[in-house]
């Protein structure tokens, strides 16, 4: 008889390969028929809560204890997030000779914290979900101060950041759902073990729905954006992935922490 852990690992492996295909398909469908999927946008917050609840179900108390005992990866990730990413965004924009508006947008993209997608990908890629959630939380708490300063310094623009709103959103869509998922894992571990194989697909379905909502709402803007801007965003993501992974390795962090740092930097604000 196959154990829940083996079934879960098999489900995760399939989900890793399916994730990009599902996201691309969702984006394409929403782009071609935006009016059909735009109503999904009103449920974005609820979708994010379901996604993060499913991530909480995969965590254990030892996972959190390990992160608490080794804060260096969190520190490294936050430093990279607010030093390497915005600086590299400026360099990429200059190298590609982007317009002033596109340059400001790329720098802003490099100056904001990670999002729910990074937590999901950390789970699918055998990273450290507890570390990913911790990085997202700390970066979000720091960003109301760092993001406006970075925008003013690198782009000469001011950026209004709703600090209280971001923190409350973090509590609603990340901390509470993850905490409830972890609590359920503690008090009903046997029942949770039975649904572990399904959790990757719950996360993928949720992210896919969020992508549909975002693409359908922004379809008109995506049409007017030049291809070179997409190239700049892609390069920025690759830079985040490579720097995150190899700096963590240089710091002699474990493989799961290196993967998590790479994902957290490359999937910023998604």
Language-model regions, residue ranges each:
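Generic transmembrane alpha-helix signature in multi-pass membrane proteins
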Residues: 63-64, 89-96, 104-109, 115-129, ...
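Mid-bilayer segments of alpha-helical transmembrane spans in multi-pass integral membrane proteins
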Residues: 86-87, 111-120, 140-149, 153, ...
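The feature identifies polytopic integral membrane transport proteins across all domains of life
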Residues: 71-78, 98-111, 127-137, 163-167, ...
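Structural signature of multi-pass alpha-helical membrane transport proteins
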Residues: 1-94, 152, 156-254
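Conserved small/polar residues in nucleotide/adenosyl-binding loops
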Residues: 268-270
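Hydrophobic/aromatic side chains embedded in well-ordered alpha-helices
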Residues: 54, 75, 107-108, 120, ...
């Amino acid at each position: 008889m196959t154990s829940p852990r083996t079934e879960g690992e098999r489900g995760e492996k399939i989900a890793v390969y399916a994730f990009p295909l599902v996201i691309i398909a969702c984006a394409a469908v929403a782009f071609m028929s935006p009016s059909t999927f735009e109503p999904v946008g009103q449920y974005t917050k609820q979708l994010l809560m379901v996604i993060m609840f499913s991530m909480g179900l995969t965590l254990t108390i030892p996972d959190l204890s390990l992160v608490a005992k080794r804060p260096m990866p969190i520190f490294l990730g936050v430093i990279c997030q607010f030093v390497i990413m915005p600086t590299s965004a400026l360099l990429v924009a200059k190298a590609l000779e982007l317009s002033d508006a596109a340059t400001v947008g790329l720098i802003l993209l490099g100056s904001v914290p990670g999002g729910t997608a990074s937590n999901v990908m950390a789970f699918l890629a055998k990273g450290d979900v507890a570390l990913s959630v911790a990085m997202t939380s700390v970066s979000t708490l720091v960003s109301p101060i760092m993001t406006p300063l970075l925008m003013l310094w690198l782009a000469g623009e001011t950026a209004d950041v709703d600090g209280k709103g971001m923190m409350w959103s973090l509590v609603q869509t990340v901390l509470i759902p993850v905490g409830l998922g972890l609590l359920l894992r503690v008090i009903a571990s046997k029942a949770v073990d039975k649904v572990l194989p399904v959790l990757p697909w719950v996360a993928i379905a949720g992210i896919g729905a969020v992508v549909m909502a975002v693409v359908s709402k922004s379809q008109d803007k995506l049409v007017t954006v030049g291809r070179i801007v997409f190239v700049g965003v892609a390069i920025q993501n690759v830079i985040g992935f490579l720097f995150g992974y190899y700096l963590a390795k240089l710091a002699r962090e474990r493989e799961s922490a290196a993967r998590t740092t790479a994902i957290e930097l490359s999937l910023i604000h998604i």
